[in-house]
């Protein structure tokens, strides 16, 4: 049987590593400063659950005057998606979850991308082998004369090899991994769930037995890199999803093997659909980028996910970032699964939109967000490029819309005329076909003579209603249908004023002509 030191030399023969020196086995300069981390894998779109994890880590760091660290866990090269790292950075910045240390900004404990830390992990794997807590395990081909893609392998520990076999396997360059020797797991304390003990006969224990810490390609597994990095980066609190509870027994034993003090663990409850099923990463509406594209504001989404698994104990669910930081506490995290009810998100977003539109500074930011969407959708209209016009639309419709995408839909009639057949059907349900031409003619004549503003338009509508002995509401509905179709909007006088005199005249004349069986061949577009 080989000594542990001989086993460790195998790693040295494959990788250029040196004795652990700078990366001391003891935590350097232990500090009471709270340090949390968000450690996503660049394997695709950021999920709602991941964003919640980032938020809670950010909130706890800021509440405690600590540091929020971003670390990219990119050791799974097969699942890595090109560009996902940039998408993660972009989304976090969109949500103003700015990291204090990490990629781009740097920091004292970098690099912050795990693929750039391979030698560090190999040094620590070497140490575990030397102390007997890890061992090399070869993948040996099952008796065959030719090795190809169909060849089957079985694992054999280097402890069970003779010197001759070790030399043979090394000369043939058989792949091998490094495995960690697990001991009987002990209960651990979680800040959310309290004392957790996993039964010795459970599936989690079986899957944890002597798990791989260094893969055949030289990359560490998630569990190993996670522990090494959390220690070296002085992480004090690990706040992550409930699905990582079974893995914590592996992590704690790794800490113990190195003689390190583990950080405090807080596991967040699962996110579930209203039917109780687990929220899947494959669900499009669970992707953060999809929600942004749908026109939800970042601050509304953050408020929404903050209420999942955490109790603010406030009367209002409306909690902007400053209040979230002030109120957040780990002891208010809940144990039960959190239902993702998007109705709440619509409610919150409507309130955030209304507040943003009412705030002079935020309104300008909102215009910058909305304008490109309008230009793309209504590129044929010069109005889509007019920021002052967009501002007026936002102010007019601030109480009507839940999302920016809904705003895009509602403002359609400010850029294009609605379907004429639909309009005729709508107005005919209000007023007889015989009366309509007379009323439309009166409206056109009246509008031709007035000064174009909301006040004058209101007076004109009252006069028209009196002249035709009709309720004012009926005249207002006639104009709403005739100018806007069946889309909702602001006050009709404000809407008419904002549409503009020429547009109103053009659309009413088109409707009048159609009633006289003189329908234009093409719809009017403004």
From Swiss-Prot:
<dbReference type="GO" id="GO:0006424">
    <property type="term" value="P:glutamyl-tRNA aminoacylation"/>
</dbReference>
<keyword id="KW-0496">Mitochondrion</keyword>
<dbReference type="InterPro" id="IPR020751">
    <property type="entry name" value="aa-tRNA-synth_I_codon-bd_sub2"/>
</dbReference>
<dbReference type="GO" id="GO:0008270">
    <property type="term" value="F:zinc ion binding"/>
</dbReference>
<dbReference type="Pfam" id="PF00749">
    <property type="entry name" value="tRNA-synt_1c"/>
</dbReference>
<dbReference type="InterPro" id="IPR014729">
    <property type="entry name" value="Rossmann-like_a/b/a_fold"/>
</dbReference>
<feature type="binding site">
    <location>
        <begin position="222"/>
        <end position="226"/>
    </location>
    <ligand>
        <name>L-glutamate</name>
    </ligand>
</feature>
<feature type="binding site">
    <location>
        <position position="73"/>
    </location>
    <ligand>
        <name>L-glutamate</name>
    </ligand>
</feature>
<keyword id="KW-0030">Aminoacyl-tRNA synthetase</keyword>
<keyword id="KW-0067">ATP-binding</keyword>
<dbReference type="GO" id="GO:0004818">
    <property type="term" value="F:glutamate-tRNA ligase activity"/>
</dbReference>
<dbReference type="InterPro" id="IPR008925">
    <property type="entry name" value="aa_tRNA-synth_I_cd-bd_sf"/>
</dbReference>
<dbReference type="GO" id="GO:0005739">
    <property type="term" value="C:mitochondrion"/>
</dbReference>
<keyword id="KW-0436">Ligase</keyword>
<comment type="function">
    <text>Catalyzes the attachment of glutamate to tRNA(Glu) in a two-step reaction: glutamate is first activated by ATP to form Glu-AMP and then transferred to the acceptor end of tRNA(Glu).</text>
</comment>
<dbReference type="InterPro" id="IPR045462">
    <property type="entry name" value="aa-tRNA-synth_I_cd-bd"/>
</dbReference>
<dbReference type="InterPro" id="IPR004527">
    <property type="entry name" value="Glu-tRNA-ligase_bac/mito"/>
</dbReference>
<dbReference type="InterPro" id="IPR033910">
    <property type="entry name" value="GluRS_core"/>
</dbReference>
<dbReference type="InterPro" id="IPR049940">
    <property type="entry name" value="GluQ/Sye"/>
</dbReference>
<dbReference type="Pfam" id="PF19269">
    <property type="entry name" value="Anticodon_2"/>
</dbReference>
<dbReference type="GO" id="GO:0005759">
    <property type="term" value="C:mitochondrial matrix"/>
</dbReference>
<feature type="binding site">
    <location>
        <position position="240"/>
    </location>
    <ligand>
        <name>L-glutamate</name>
    </ligand>
</feature>
<dbReference type="InterPro" id="IPR000924">
    <property type="entry name" value="Glu/Gln-tRNA-synth"/>
</dbReference>
<protein>
    <recommendedName>
        <fullName>Glutamate--tRNA ligase, mitochondrial</fullName>
        <ecNumber>6.1.1.17</ecNumber>
    </recommendedName>
</protein>
<keyword id="KW-0694">RNA-binding</keyword>
<feature type="binding site">
    <location>
        <begin position="278"/>
        <end position="282"/>
    </location>
    <ligand>
        <name>ATP</name>
    </ligand>
</feature>
<keyword id="KW-0648">Protein biosynthesis</keyword>
<feature type="binding site">
    <location>
        <position position="243"/>
    </location>
    <ligand>
        <name>ATP</name>
    </ligand>
</feature>
<feature type="short sequence motif" description="'HIGH' region">
    <location>
        <begin position="42"/>
        <end position="50"/>
    </location>
</feature>
<dbReference type="GO" id="GO:0032543">
    <property type="term" value="P:mitochondrial translation"/>
</dbReference>
<keyword id="KW-0547">Nucleotide-binding</keyword>
<feature type="binding site">
    <location>
        <begin position="37"/>
        <end position="39"/>
    </location>
    <ligand>
        <name>L-glutamate</name>
    </ligand>
</feature>
<dbReference type="InterPro" id="IPR020058">
    <property type="entry name" value="Glu/Gln-tRNA-synth_Ib_cat-dom"/>
</dbReference>
<feature type="short sequence motif" description="'KMSKS' region">
    <location>
        <begin position="278"/>
        <end position="282"/>
    </location>
</feature>
<feature type="transit peptide" description="Mitochondrion">
    <location>
        <begin position="1"/>
        <end position="38"/>
    </location>
</feature>
<feature type="binding site">
    <location>
        <position position="47"/>
    </location>
    <ligand>
        <name>ATP</name>
    </ligand>
</feature>
<keyword id="KW-0809">Transit peptide</keyword>
<dbReference type="GO" id="GO:0000049">
    <property type="term" value="F:tRNA binding"/>
</dbReference>
<dbReference type="GO" id="GO:0005524">
    <property type="term" value="F:ATP binding"/>
</dbReference>
<comment type="similarity">
    <text>Belongs to the class-I aminoacyl-tRNA synthetase family. Glutamate--tRNA ligase type 1 subfamily.</text>
</comment>
